[in-house]
Amino acid sequence: MAGFGQTVKLQQEIEKVVDEVGVQKPNNDPYASLRAEQESMSHIIKTHSFAGIFGFDGTGKSAIVLDAFDKDETKINDSVLHAVDFDNGVGMLNSAIYDNPNVVSWNPWKMGSKDRTAYDYPGTHQRVMDIMKYIISEVEKGVPVWGVLVSGLDSWLEICTNNMRIIDLGLAKDGIDAADNRGAGEAKRVERQSDWAIRNTRFHQLTKLSRDLVRLGVRVYWETHMRSTNFSYKDDAPVVWQPEWEKKTNNYLPTLIRMDATNEYNDEDELVSTTYTATYTKCKTNPSLVNQTKTVMVTTTGEEPKWYGLPDLYDGTL
């Protein structure tokens, strides 16, 4: 049996090794994990860019984001722009103009297994969630992600509406049934206004994941088309157009940009030029931009287009 002196010596050697490897002794700080989290926040590059871009088809919505990614000289080498590309507009535009391999165009649609419907709406919803979570995991591992563009957000609204009717309320068996909301066939109508909260909750799961990306220093852009909010066969009032997304979305996005195209004609009613513009309808990070309109592109008959883009998306203006 070892003597006490040997035991003490051995204990001293153990304590020396413990001190050298830096083993932490338990402490009574109940907020230790929060302090560590706060420390990690100081190393995150914050952009605070979360913008909604809306307008009619062909007004340059996706183009201004792709151009910003291409022109931003401050971005980290090998940075990636991910696109959740519902209408494949980002993929086609990148292929035709930029051909940038660091633009990743994700197809969010999951094909249906039956002949009756082309898409599996519940599977598509889950696939979108998985793509966003994957991007978050890449950022957390240190992969440089410049931004995420969700293109064709009106399709996401449709997916959430159909899943509410198919999965949550059991009013339809597939996407075709879900599209028939007349209540005339087997598919029933949504009976209570409160039921629409289910659709909205589904929709804003994407909001939650987008905010998580913004907190990690990633720019997030939502792009959608327009819809008429007062159409009536009996009413001659001017049509009121609004972005095609869940109606509370305007409250959740810090920046809103409306894209327009204005045509100019000559005395013979022939098209002379088209001016494409971006107008800020909301900007919490730079209120001086609100109601400002900036020219993005001008096309003139018989001439090459003049492209200006929207440098605000990468030069620090926002």
Description of each model-found segment:
Residues A2-A36, H43-A51, Y265-L318:
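C-terminal regions of RecA-like/P-loop NTPase motor modules
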Residues E37-S40, G60-A63, T207-K208, P243-E244:
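A generic local structural motif
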Residues M41-V143, G147-V148, E158-N162:
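Conserved P-loop
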Residues I45-H48, F56, A68-N77, F86, ...:
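Phosphate-handling catalytic cores of nucleic-acid transaction enzymes
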Residues A83, S151, L253:
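Residue-level signature of catalytic and energy-coupling elements of molecular machines
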Residues N107-G112, K173-A178, E244-K248, E303-G309:
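Glycine-rich loops and low-complexity Gly/Arg-rich segments
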Residues P144-K248:
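P-loop NTPase motor core
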Residues D212-T301:
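Phosphate-binding/switch region of NTP-binding enzymes
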